[in-house]
């Protein structure tokens, strides 16, 4: 076995007898230590078949047969692994070597100087020849020479075998350091790439978060500004609504005055309404004949809710003269209803009559008393926004929806067992007409849904504080340009001017009529005073007593409270106007001054309206007298029509009940004749009872 720490043994030569013995040459210097070189990557290594072919070709070029391949002449480097031996030789161009070395197989002694001493460019400048040889595993032990090379140069180390010439063999360990290094570098690159990606994602996330935060902040600022504008608009709407309510108050009072002298006005209006008539049964219809007035009033604040008041005459069903149903909004914005308890006479309760009447559950008064019905709010909205806004619309209908519905039910009963024949040619026309009717019904529903009553409420119970009015004025006037205030001011002035023109002309005409015919008015009053015992006049006065004056006596307390509320609201409105003027003086804005001018104009207009209302009272007295005279003349006609309608709608039973009621009314009217005669004097001076307008 070769020992690397021992030097190669010297080759002995045979001496002839004639030659004299010479001295032995000096031993070569010790070889440098072995260096371990890594193998090339597997993809760069030649295959076994290619190695054997290359070794055979090299052997043929050197003139050697097909026998075992001999190593090339030194200097060369052998790389051996797994039975494959590779020879690396330097060409003749390399300095420090003879050209005869290639053909002589080590005949010339190896150079004393090592390749390690050569500089790097000289060591790598020569040509490189590679030989391959396949050897057996046992031949590895017989190799004589071992030489190592490094990255800088060649460092030969020879183990000389006595049978073979000098050889340099490099043993390479099987460690894939290049592969590991490449894998490490690829891992580093992947890590760097991932770090960069994570960094980019983090930066983009932070950028998006900052951008979204800025967008949300801008949206929040806009929403806050919009809410501030909405608050100002709401307060301005409330202020404008109060003004229009005050403007409409005298007209509503006139309307109530006229309606109270029309017999059966409200019962007919309720029965002709298509949605409310569903709740009115036969008994409710009898009760509604005693209804004299209907009022819809706001609560202390408009946004809090409203209440409905129903005024009745003395009737055999209950003792209440006024029943009130109040709708108030809670914190969640839902309407919560409350009503005054109805004090029924004995035996007239709806619960006692429910066993004998199946229609008792569908009753107007059961809805009035029950606060858990889901349709209660809807019915109240219909009464407030539709019926009370324009009751004349439903009063002037020829037949009520209740009669039409009964006719339709009768037709259905008659044609229930019959077959209907439809001609296919006329079918498109039939469907077209059906679509037209459906569109008309949709239009009617949309018209009913319009809340005209937003500007129609009475302000009998409307109260505001000075602080609220000043806050509203400050919020409306502050931070607004005068250009924005000019448009609504012009509109309000135009409306006021137009209203002044129409109303003043009408009122002047009526006043002229009164002035032209003062004698006629005096004659009428004289006739009434001269003939107190006239049957026609007594009946007319009885009509006043039963139709209006009796209800006036019952509603005296409510009118007093209404007048007190009117005075309080007027005082508060005046205080609010003073607050407006003070705010305008402090701020110095044009918008405040314009608002104060509008308030002054409104106050002047209200004063004119009140004066006109006082002037028109004489006309109303004439109208009342004419209505009373016409009612006396048309008594027989109305009774005949009433009997026909009762026979058609309710039958003979209802007719007899209505006659009994009228007889009772006549008896009570005859007993109170003296009170009735004072009715015209009571209506001649309506302003003495309280402040109007």
UniProtKB/Swiss-Prot annotation:
Domain of life where this protein originates: Eukaryota
Listed Pro residues bias regions: 23-44
Outcome of substituting residue 262 to M: Found in patients with mild intellectual disability; uncertain significance
UniProt modified residues of type Phosphoserine: 18, 20, 658, 668, 671
Alphabetically ordered keywords of this record: Cell cycle, Chromatin regulator, Cytoplasm, Isopeptide bond, Nucleus, Phosphoprotein, Transcription, Transcription regulation, Ubl conjugation
Cross-referenced InterPro entries: NAP-like_sf, NAP_family
Gene3D superfamilies in alphabetical order: 1.20.5.1500, Nucleosome assembly protein
Modification comment: Phosphorylation at Ser-20 and/or Thr-340 impairs function on cell proliferation.
Family according to the record: Belongs to the nucleosome assembly protein (NAP) family.
Biological function: Part of the CASK/TBR1/TSPYL2 transcriptional complex which modulates gene expression in response to neuronal synaptic activity, probably by facilitating nucleosome assembly. May inhibit cell proliferation by inducing p53-dependent CDKN1A expression.
Name assigned to this protein: Testis-specific Y-encoded-like protein 2
